Amino acid sequence: MFITLEGPEGAGKSTNRDYLAARLREQGLDVVLTREPGGTPLAEKVRELLLAPSDEVMAADTELLLVFAARAQHLAQVIRPALARGAVVLCDRFTDATYAYQGGGRGLSVERIAALEQFVQGELRPDLTLVFDLPVEVGLARAAARGRLDRFEQEGQAFFEAVRQAYLQRARREPQRYDLLDAAQPLEAVQRAIDALLPGILERCRG
């Protein structure tokens, strides 16, 4: 089963990915934790290019192509092999993030992203996507509290409002794949919401 965790900056995706992994492992499941961009040594180098602040402005198309280049490597080396052996893959961001950040935030066309998605992924799509939603100002405050901001975190409020709306639109359009969680709540409340989803996730994993 392929589960992705999505959401804007400061939504707690990594923390909750680790929590969900622990809960699934308690049930004896083989769980692979990974992230995007990244997940392999080569893809992590691409991640550094994407996130590191630079004096050179990165063109939006360059950003998009780098994201999918890293994804192609990640799929080949980690995600597809893990799914083939029957593992549960938990990935912090995947292609929904591309539609949200490069589509919503950068304004690139959905058609262009979809063409690359088909080329790189074929028919592979997540089985379940958890979207951790919260107001932009809350997420940015959390990101700032972590320390130095990366290249994306330095974007303004309007960028992240567009990112958030893109996520919400995708979740509304395909409710059978997405579960929307209120990430503005205290962590314990978010994790109780994850616990409520566990029976359904376990049933699908074992189905």
From Swiss-Prot:
Binding site for ATP: 7-14
Any one Gene Ontology molecular-function term assigned to this protein's record: ATP binding
Catalytic activity: dTMP + ATP = dTDP + ADP
Transmembrane segments: none
Entry keyword annotation includes Nucleotide-binding: yes
Disulphide-bonded residues: none
Organism domain of life: Bacteria
Entries under SUPFAM superfamilies matching the protein: P-loop containing nucleoside triphosphate hydrolases
Entry EC number(s): 2.7.4.9
GO cellular component, one term: cytosol
Annotated GO biological process: dTDP biosynthetic process; dTTP biosynthetic process; dUDP biosynthetic process
Record's keyword annotation contains Transmembrane helix: no
Keywords carried by this UniProt record: ATP-binding, Kinase, Nucleotide biosynthesis, Nucleotide-binding, Transferase
Any Pfam family hit: Thymidylate_kin
Class of this enzyme: transferase
Family from the record: Belongs to the thymidylate kinase family.
Protein function: Phosphorylation of dTMP to form dTDP in both de novo and salvage pathways of dTTP synthesis.
Protein name: Thymidylate kinase
Provenance organism: Pseudomonas putida (strain W619)
